[in-house]
Amino acid sequence: MIFVILEHILTHISFSIIAIVITTHLMTLLVHEIVGLCDSSEKGMIATFFCITGLLVTRWIYSGHFPLNDLYESLMFLSWSFSLILMVPYFKNHKNHFSTITAPSAICTQSFATSGLSTEIHQSEILVPALQSHWLMMHVSMMLLSYAALLCGSLLSIALLVITFRKNIDMIGFTNHLLIWPFSFGEIKYLNEKRSLLKNTSFLLFRNYHRYQLTQRLDHWSYRVIGLGFTFSTIGILSGAVWANEAWGSYWNWDPKETWAFITWTISAIYSHTRTNKSLQGMNSAIVASMGFLIIWICYFGVNLLGIGLHSYGSFT
């Protein structure tokens, strides 16, 4: 009973901290002068990581098995993975924007796990025979870590596309404004006082320099995180194939979950290939990564919604 109470306490604490982190991010967007809030939000995600870690360990102790048995436990592990991904660059003193991505991802995942699922699913149950294997921890944990990494990388690529698209709109608007200026005597007089139109153009380039640096960082971290997720996915699929051979006598059965896992892995491989070709880097590779965002969620939730196939033990029903 004490473990159940402790689990509820840790769940509420972690959820509250993530909510505070998101509020902090909104404040930094409105008030740029409060620099310390950004660092505080990243520390809040680290505190969330330890809370969810305690929650999973507590559930592991009183259930007697690694907490990856059902959809609720996998969602909590996914939320834990989002927090874990943030910690690596943070402790290496790299400036990044992971907390902007991981905080909403973690709170949405945890909100759905705690509020979107029925309370019966929250109860830990005995492992079904197919899951009573030492491969459970290796296969499922690697796949969930890959989902978290690939989702973060995809969101970073989506952010890159949005910023680039807005930049192109601003440049088009600025060009159209320049075409109107020569017809206005007042504007020509103003430009003469400023000595040249080039000065205004330089100001625009200076204003967009920070945006350029941001897109470069987003592209860099998106590539690194997706590469990490691709590695986890490869390990997870290989370990799952070995486990399937032991449990069902075949390495691959083209189960719906296996099929979508293969599609997810293929998209990640295509993205990695586009990064090796300089002509395909930037926007093209970001579009491929953005496609992976939808495919990953189909892979993760698709079988659970349908409730069919060899992996249907984790379905909503």
Curated annotation (Swiss-Prot):
NCBIfam families, per database record:
cytochr_II_ccsB
- Specify the species: Illicium oligandrum
- Claim: Thylakoid is one of the keywords in the record: yes
Q: Which GO terms describe its molecular function?
A: heme binding
Read off the HAMAP family from this record.
CytC_CcsA
Question: What cellular component GO annotations does this protein have?
Answer: chloroplast thylakoid membrane; plasma membrane
Q: What name does this protein carry?
A: Cytochrome c biogenesis protein CcsA
According to Swiss-Prot or TrEMBL, what is its membrane topology? Multi-pass membrane protein
